[in-house]
């Protein structure tokens, strides 16, 4: 018996009825869909979290840039996929949300971490808009969103090269496709004034070759040209390459679209070790190390003096 007629809102449609039969007989329905934002790291399977792998295996559909899905290898072999090209980010996220609205568990595959310069923010931006304002359908706005974190390029680069992120750092994308260069320039000045280690994402593209040189010149106003710079390319892949440079010697022609550029702070140091090179940024333990060393030296001198007395 119908108690309250159907009513609609922006978030739900409902009606209320009373039944004399319990439990209810099987009724046709559709399970709620889910969008899974999955960061797969830079590309190496061993760097993918178990949670990300489980989400991929449980997905009804994989959505993403075709290269990123290809990086999954055998893990994606038997799962339906919808490939998108670079530049189709909005279409990618919109499709994932609307597909999930039909009851599917849709995995949006992102390199690195889905919430760092990836699709996570765009998915939420679409959910934050009404359909009339360019958002998604009301059904798509009701899907569940789950996120599996991934290793971002700055983390992978730091791990491969030592501990350049040992103290305060920031990340700045040099792509001015969506962000005005004036805003990016302002952030570089702020990073320089704050003496942050800086990880530059999207340093160059085929058409964009001037921003990294400009960023280098800005940072040299705040720190010397001798601070270490790391060029980390194709991290976690067979063609991985690390190059150790200084800010003053940074050559833009050594950088490509797959490179993350890490610029050290004024305190960052470069080491040449027997097993290779490394860069690190001290956390601030020097005064403790100096104090302990002074105490050890004083104790050694005292023991030597006592030995002479006896």
Question: What spans do the regions from the language model cover?
Answer:
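A contiguous loop/helix-start segment that scaffolds small-molecule binding in enzyme catalytic cores
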Residues: 1-37, 105-106, 193-298
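Short gly/ser/thr-rich secondary-structure transition/capping motifs
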Residues: 40-47, 179-181, 243-244
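Class I SAM-dependent methyltransferase SAM-binding "motif I" and its flanking Rossmann-like core
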Residues: 118-194
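Class I S-adenosyl-L-methionine
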Residues: 15-26, 30-45, 50-145, 251, ...
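Conserved small/polar residues in nucleotide/adenosyl-binding loops
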Residues: 299-307
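Short gly/pro/ser/thr-enriched loop/turn and capping motifs at secondary-structure boundaries
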Residues: 69-71, 89-90, 116, 152-155, ...
